[in-house]
Amino acid sequence: MRFLLLVLAVALLSGEEGTDSTVWSQYARGGLSHDQGKSGGHGYYRINRKTVTSFRDLRLFGYGLGDDSYIYLRYKSSTKYSENVKLYNFTTASYQKNTRADLAMRYHFNQGFGYFINEYNNGHVTGELGHAYDMSDFLNDTRKTSYLKGGIFWDHELGKISTKLETEWFKQISDVVTTDLSRVQFFAEISYQLNNLLSLIMGFEQDYYTANKQSPQSYYFSLGWQK
């Protein structure tokens, strides 16, 4: 885990040299979570680096629900082919541990191409298509699975209010495991800016597994900080 953090930190700092257009941002959150009948607390930290053509983003999220805990670490890198081109490539690597789901660990990797479907003054809509790979350990039962991956992402700002809507689709294409882990993931978030640093945030997440029709979902309410 420490080695993975080091690799992701180096990746975040690497790349093209800083220019006048380079923008660094940091975010932190703390609040309440509710997942399948259990309530608890959560914490979140995010740092990203943007230029005209590139985006590097590192996120760390964790929560506790009674005796259960969840940890999620994700790094995403995306690069436009040029400033005026809407097409970009992306790479995502993540680590998860979820004691409630008996998930000892999951390493996830995906890469592919994205396209800015619509860019406007207050936000943008992007679409992505690529290949994804999971390596999971459920109570010492190791599973290696690959998927086709697609997604639609919408970010919008209106005054002090900002919203995010995301839908990602994973279609299992490997037969290494007998269980079909194909799924659709939904995410929605709305935030209200209290001042230059603080905001109130509400969000909803749901996974829908197409084979067994299971659809675990969670809600959260946070106080956020941004610099």
Task: Put a short name on every predicted segment.
Residues 216-227:
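Outer-membrane beta-barrel "beta-signal"
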Residues 28-34, 58-64, 75-77, 91-95, ...:
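Transmembrane beta-barrel strands of outer-membrane/channel proteins
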Residues 1-22:
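Cleavable N-terminal export/targeting peptides
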Residues 16-66, 111, 199:
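Outer-membrane beta-barrel initiation region
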Residues 43-47, 73-77, 111, 150-152, ...:
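Membrane-embedded beta-strands of outer-membrane beta-barrel proteins
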Residues 32-42, 63-71, 97-105, 137-144, ...:
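Solvent-exposed loop/turn segments connecting transmembrane beta-strands
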Residues 51-58, 82-89, 121-125, 157-165, ...:
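Repeated loop/turn-to-beta-strand initiation elements of outer-membrane beta-barrel proteins
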Residues 122-174:
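Detector for outer-membrane/organellar transmembrane beta-barrel domains
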